[in-house]
Amino acid sequence: MDFAMSAKAIDYRTRLSDFMTEHVFGAEADYDDYRRAAGPADHTAPPIIEELKTKAKDRGLWNLFLSAESGLTNLEYAPLAEMTGWSMEIAPEALNCAAPDTGNMEILHMFGTEQQRAQWLRPLLDGKIRSAFSMTEPAVASSDARNIETTISRDGADYVINGRKWWTSGAADPRCKILIVMGRTNPDAAAHQQQSMVLVPIDTPGVTIVRSTPVFGWQDRHGHCEIDYHNVRVPATNLLGEEGSGFAIAQARLGPGRIHHCMRALGAAERALALMVNRVRNRVAFGRPLAEQGVVQQAIAQSRNEIDQARLLCEKAAWTIDQHGNKEARHLVAMIKAVAPRVACDVIDRAIQVHGAAGVSDDTPLARLYGWHRAMRIFDGPDEVHLRSIARAELSREKSTFAAAVT
């Protein structure tokens, strides 16, 4: 098991580092000014985003997440995803590596027909449109996908969709043109073969965006939408994959995507730690620099330990997917999804505490980062679901020779 960076990954890291320091960090003030002036109800992209996308393309820093485009493995891409986490609202989109588009592009690449790829994947890869993934429902516990109630009924040459979704991330962005909707097509089939996915253009009659739901009172720019689907009719050719394959497609989508999310979370944690260290070097309390206070040193050391431990676990998951596939890595992916967001929350929380009142204000990115990563402990499966999966795997594991000898 070797996590050393390849020459290709090192080259990308160098170029991405230069891009971040020369263009991305300096663009954050422009981005924030635009958002502040536009107001929370406005979901348009600040012009600086398109400028950065052009620069990223020119530098070959585009679609790095998709191996078919970049040639990078999951392990090679992981540290690059972490780097983008230092500027979570700008860097991933500037590189066309932002969720939910990344997962949607992956499943279109894996399961889409030639026509579907030409119509939707190509514009997404070119950064001309955006997309959303519509799976979670307000009326049921959607952490168990078998509960999904939205129906996708065959009617001649069409499918008709009825149901209500929420937390459909990305649907409020005016550039969002396509929704990937998961619903029940085969109610009499086995539990994990009842669901399917269909491609729904966002302007299809019957699609109504009810609202964009705030996260801890903050409206994300791309929105997290509650959507009503009422007799939404799309051609049967809009089926993604096969009928009954929705659950399998969702699992294929979430494997690498969770690694991307978790590595970005560690990038955000690194930024919080950097802010913490800078703060304690420059503040004095009770006649001594904060950096000399034992409790502060403990917070810094604990944060470094946790970030590095979580990173190694993420790298192991990425390596396992590369070597053995998503199925073999599923428990490792569950582990990182339970670990990385909590680590990020804990590190950011310590940084907030060190900053005092400034930490909960908009003068630093810490409050925003905390809100996002606390939400991350719920989306893509709550902690409890992943911990349940890990525990069940451990309980079903055959005893090792040593375990058998001592138990």
UniProtKB/Swiss-Prot annotation:
It catalyses: a 2,3-saturated acyl-CoA + A = a 2,3-dehydroacyl-CoA + AH2. Disulfide bonds: none annotated. Gene3D superfamilies: Acyl-CoA dehydrogenase/oxidase, N-terminal domain, Butyryl-CoA Dehydrogenase, subunit A, domain 2, Butyryl-CoA Dehydrogenase, subunit A, domain 3. Its EC number is 1.3.99.-. Pfam families: Acyl-CoA_dh_1 (PF00441), Acyl-CoA_dh_M (PF02770). InterPro entries: Acyl-CoA_dehydrogenase, Acyl-CoA_Oxase/DH_mid-dom, Acyl-CoA_Oxase/DH_mid-dom_sf, AcylCo_DH-like_C, AcylCo_DH/oxidase_C, AcylCoA_DH/ox_N_sf, AcylCoA_DH/oxidase_NM_dom_sf. GO terms for biological process: fatty acid beta-oxidation using acyl-CoA dehydrogenase. Its cofactor is FAD. One of its GO terms (molecular function) is acyl-CoA dehydrogenase activity. Coiled coil: none annotated. The keyword Hydrolase does not apply. Keywords: FAD, Flavoprotein, Oxidoreductase. It is an enzyme of class 1 (oxidoreductase). GO terms for cellular component: cytoplasm; plasma membrane. Belongs to the acyl-CoA dehydrogenase family. This is Probable acyl-CoA dehydrogenase FadE2. It comes from Mycobacterium tuberculosis (strain ATCC 25618 / H37Rv). The gene is fadE2.
